[in-house]
Amino acid sequence: MSIISPQDVKKLREETNAGFGDCKKALSVAGGDFELAKKKLREMGIASAEKRLDRDAKEGRVFSYSNNIYAGLLLVSCETDFVALNHNFVNFGNSLIKELVESGIDSLTTSQELELKNLAATIKENIQVKKIFITKIQSNEFVKIYLHGEQSKIGVLVKLKVNDFSKTEDKIFKNFAMDLALHVAAFAPVYLRNDDVCPNYIKEQEEIFTKQLESSGKPESIIKGIVAGKIKKHLAEISLLEQSFVKNDKITVKEMLEEISKAISSKVEMVEFKYLRIG
């Protein structure tokens, strides 16, 4: 039986980031063979990682990347905010979103899934890739990405179409793009425009509002008018273009787009947005 020295255990820990006890056990099982010990650690870690999948993973962070061909956001969850700051966790997320964007694919490969399991095994938490968003950037489209706070618990991507793309260098446009991303982070719209809202959802809301007013004693025609007003207000809360703009609540985002178009002498249109949030 080979003797496992503290130096051997230390070396294996430095190479794998696994715990002292796990490294010692792996070296013992492997008879002191470092490569075999690494394999044993991976096997041990993946098995224990599978057991953690039922544990809550309510922390984490959002990662982003853009290469001017594709842009994307990635939400990776973990169990504690401490791990969300762990350099192995952060490096994994940054590396993964870069790989996904450069490939233009919004799903994990087998090797990426294995990397995820190995990370969970090393850190000993339930770590999951919750959401992946990848979008292709056309020649006349501008993408702005915003990550909120040190832990990046909110991630926003907005895509704008600009007829004269040279105008995207204008300071007015750049400030607006940033403000728009901040707006999405602050107000968390669900849809881009009213037309995107599912008709069944609107019908359900109408029924709810009508039910709430049944005991009011008001005539049916009045109730219909009130319900229509409530629906309009609700849509303005969940549709980005209808929301009051974060920097000027007297106008909507749609109206602000028109003002920016005039200010830079080029039509600016909202193409899409994505909002991701931890928790």
From Swiss-Prot:
NCBIfam families the UniProt entry points to: tsf (TIGR00116)
CDD domains in the record, alphabetically?
UBA_EF-Ts
Name the chain's protein. Elongation factor Ts
Known Pfam families for this protein? EF_TS
Assigned keywords, A-Z: Cytoplasm, Elongation factor, Protein biosynthesis
Fetch the Gene3D superfamilies from UniProt: 1.10.286.20, DNA helicase RuvA subunit, C-terminal domain, Elongation factor Ts, dimerisation domain
Name which cysteines form disulfide bonds: none
Q: Where in the cell is it found?
A: Cytoplasm
Q: What family does the database annotate?
A: Belongs to the EF-Ts family.
Involved in Mg(2+) ion dislocation from EF-Tu: annotated segments: 80-83
Q: Does the keyword Ribonucleoprotein apply?
A: no
**What are the protein's GO molecular function terms?**
translation elongation factor activity
Function text: Associates with the EF-Tu.GDP complex and induces the exchange of GDP to GTP. It remains bound to the aminoacyl-tRNA.EF-Tu.GTP complex up to the GTP hydrolysis stage on the ribosome.
Would you tell me the Gene Ontology cellular component terms? cytosol
User: Among its keywords, does the record have Cytoplasm?
Assistant: yes
